[in-house]
């Protein structure tokens, strides 16, 4: 099936670019219906415009609370015809208003091997803890902070001379591939969502017929 995507960004939009490039190359059966940024100057908006994708700026500062901000996002996404939402460097915590409008159809890419190092500055957290391997995770979004069901992960070794900047750039390259990998699997019908069986439970997700991870990055350094 062709995925109708709404992509939410806050910055440079490199993961958005990976999606656009994969679509253009015929590697991803999807259409980006709308790119929304909460920041007017986000460079990712230019990436979308260059690809002929509609854009919108919806500032969180123009809304009194998170719920009303998310309601504005839902309205714009619905009008554009999006049925899946990708948080691609979107630096806002979403609420049930957005999640209920797109049940089990909101994805996020996070720069760690969750559940390790959730929240902001995951790369710095990895370095501070002295781990030897970190990476990135694509997961469905739920009401928690980076706690939703994991769809796929890719590992990146932490090198002895890594700085936060160097590690971040190497993880980012893996993010691009992993996000496209997961979206392509969803488009191919390999995503199964099992609804929660109790109020306290949460949805269980399976990606079937495809690898759940892209493996460990290799390096010649």
Residue ranges and their predicted role:
Residues 1-4, 27, 57, 160, ...:
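An anion-binding loop in the catalytic cleft
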Residues 1-43:
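N-terminal Rossmann-like dinucleotide-binding module
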Residues 22, 88-202:
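Donor/substrate-binding cores of folate-linked one-carbon enzymes
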Residues 30-68, 72:
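Short, surface-exposed acidic-centric catalytic microdomains
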Residues 33, 83, 104:
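Conserved acidic residues
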Residues 37-38, 61-62, 66-67, 80-96:
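N-terminal glycine-rich "phosphate-gripper" loop used for MgATP/nucleotide binding
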Residues 54, 83, 132:
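Residue-level detector of anion-binding/catalytic polar loops
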């Amino acid at each position: 099936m062709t995925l109708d995507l709404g992509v939410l960004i806050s910055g440079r939009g490199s993961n958005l670019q990976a999606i656009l490039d994969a679509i253009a190359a015929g590697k991803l059966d999807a259409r980006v219906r709308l790119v929304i940024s909460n920041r007017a100057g986000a460079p990712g908006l230019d990436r979308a415009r260059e690809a002929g994708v509609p854009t919108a700026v919806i500032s969180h500062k123009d809304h009194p609370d998170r719920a009303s901000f998310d309601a504005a996002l839902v309205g714009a996404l619905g009008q554009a015809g999006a049925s899946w939402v990708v948080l691609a460097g979107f630096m806002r915590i979403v609420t049930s208003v957005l999640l209920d409008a797109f049940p089990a159809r909101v994805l996020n890419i996070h720069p760690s091997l969750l559940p390790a190092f959730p929240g902001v500055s995951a790369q710095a957290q990895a370095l501070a803890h002295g781990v030897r391997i970190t990476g990135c995770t694509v997961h469905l979004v739920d009401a928690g902070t980076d706690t939703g069901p994991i769809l796929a992960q890719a590992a990146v070794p932490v090198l002895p001379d890594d700085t936060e900047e160097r590690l971040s750039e190497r993880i980012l390259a893996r993010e691009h591939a992993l996000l496209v990998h997961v979206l392509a699997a969803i488009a191919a019908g390999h995503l199964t969502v099992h609804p929660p069986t109790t109020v306290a439970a949460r949805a269980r997700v399976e990606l079937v017929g495809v690898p759940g991870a892209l493996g460990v990055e290799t390096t010649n350094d």
